[in-house]
Amino acid sequence: MLQKRLFYLDNLKVCLTVLVIFHHAGQAYGDGGGWAYHPSNPAEVMPWIWHFFSTNAAFFMGLYFLISGYFVPKSFDKQGAGTFVKKKLIRLGIPWLLMGGLLSVLAGKLETGHMWFVENLLFFSLVYAGIRLFCKPLLSCTSKPTIIGLFIVGALMGVGSYFIRQESPQDHWIFWMGLIFEPAHYLQYVMMFFLGILACRFEWLEKMENRIGAIALLIGIVLAIGNYARDGGEWNAFVYRWFGIYESLMCVFISFGLLWLFREYGNWSSRFWQWCAAQSYGAYIFHMILMLLLQYATDTIWMRAFGKFMFIGTAITIASFVLTWLVRMIPGVKKVL
């Protein structure tokens, strides 16, 4: 029996892809860190946008990993180890090598950029396949998401992240044995991927009660507002000190809250949303190059920082999805994108 298409997960991934694009669009006009482009006009800056970056980084890639992990068990069960690994190497390995190679050539050094996600998702999938060769799949059980359960998961993630950040602070990236990763967030990504696997096996997304989903979303929103409210003072000092824990709780509650919200109110299946879902993976892959080209091309055009941010984000969102659609018309490309 064919599994019913979960349109709400497709739609949520589309929204996450757009959020990633806007996140990167803003980096040049805030604290871009290692961003490849910096405006020549020093007035093009948005000091407040670090709140946007901080809140996004708390959950959006973790939620990506959870959704990706959700589809892994049934894909492995259906295809078997050999086909599963082969398809992952094609769909994840080829874009990682090609885009990573292009970014490295442009940067003049080894550089994977945003492809770190694809690289690590491939690694997680291969580890899962290796484990399944020796272990039987997890059996179903009657458990379902609860607020206390979500809090415990967030707290465990947070305590671990807190201690990791004592040695490796946020935005410190490491290249190790072919993998590039940020230790400060890595525990979150591993746990969220594993939660996705459990959510599939135990049918947590289907079992999550409306009351639990709504409360989780409300808690996540309150934590996000608290993060945006940081502006010096005791509250900022408190959140900054315990941010590994604060961020992890925000990640878990926002993620499960959004999963509930889209399950109940975002299960659209129009042709437009199905088209967007089909292009979202490629849009993630292509958007970085397109964005840098447009940022350099519009460097001397004055729109104010917020205007540039919105223009770049909107234009590259459209361009990335359209470019993916065109590239996927090439025979054989749909197996990759």
Predicted region positions:
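Alpha-helical transmembrane segments and their immediate juxtamembrane cytosolic regions
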Residues: 1-337
